[in-house]
Amino acid sequence: MQDGRQLNYQTARFLTSAPGLAQCPPDQGAEVAFAGRSNAGKSSAINTLTQQKALARTSKTPGRTQLINFFTLANDETYRLVDLPGYGFAKVPDQVKLEWQRHLSEYLYERATLRGLMLVMDVRHPLSEFDQMMLGWADEKAMPVHILLTKADKLKPGAAKSALLAVRRQLADWEDLVSVQLFSALKRQGVDEARARMDAWLLHQAQ
């Protein structure tokens, strides 16, 4: 973070939706993207971090919404949050899955303003096939990743801490690229830590 500054995430407002890279807003400024399985609590995490109940909307059909959603901060398009499509393996036809992978990989590889990836995982079911695919893509681009282990309130504190340590051990080889924290939208646990990570990415890189 530069000079102790902080962004006001409560000012987040919807900007636009894009089906693919070509329809995204101009590649200027700085972005932080959120990715996660359809049932990992990604929308709840975004809404909690911005203190808005319905900024990010949850699809009733997991994996069907294929749009990339952009949000601006403080009516300034310099800083953006990006909600990447949720991924529901079981209910997605192969053709849709391939298209999703193509659009997402294009965004991750070619979007110059992408400064970091917030990867949302259910603390009870971390490091799924999807999560590992995302980490692999991030590793290839040397993209920093901050993992939110969501729904931490579903576990007792000791079990949640054990899950956190287990994920950190599994990702020890990537410790320079990946950081991990517990998060609960219901209890607002981990909000300050997650915001500080986004501030560091957005404010440092947008100078």
From Swiss-Prot:
All copies of domain EngB-type G, residue ranges: 28-204
InterPro entries, A to Z: G_ENGB_dom, GTP-bd, GTP-bd_ribosome_bio_YsxC, P-loop_NTPase
Residues annotated as binding Mg(2+): S43, T65
Keywords assigned: Cell cycle, Cell division, GTP-binding, Magnesium, Metal-binding, Nucleotide-binding, Septation
Coiled-coil zones: none
A single GO BP: division septum assembly
PROSITE patterns: G_ENGB
Superkingdom classification of source: Bacteria
SUPFAM superfamilies: P-loop containing nucleoside triphosphate hydrolases
Pfam families per the UniProt record, alphabetical: MMR_HSR1 (PF01926)
CDD domains, per the entry: YihA_EngB (cd01876)
Residues spanning the signal sequence: none
Names of required cofactors: Mg(2+)
GO MF terms, alphabetically ordered: GTP binding; metal ion binding
Annotated GTP binding sites: 36-43, 63-67, 83-86, 150-153, 182-185
GO cellular component: cytosol
Family assignment from sequence similarity: Belongs to the TRAFAC class TrmE-Era-EngA-EngB-Septin-like GTPase superfamily. EngB GTPase family.
Function summary: Necessary for normal cell division and for the maintenance of normal septation.
Stored HAMAP family: GTPase_EngB
NCBIfam families, per database record: GTPase_YsxC
PANTHER family named in the record: ENGB-TYPE G DOMAIN-CONTAINING PROTEIN, MSS1/TRME-RELATED GTP-BINDING PROTEIN
Protein name, UniProt field: Probable GTP-binding protein EngB
Source organism: Chromohalobacter salexigens (strain ATCC BAA-138 / DSM 3043 / CIP 106854 / NCIMB 13768 / 1H11)
High-level lineage: Bacteria, Pseudomonadati, Pseudomonadota, Gammaproteobacteria, Oceanospirillales
The encoding gene: engB
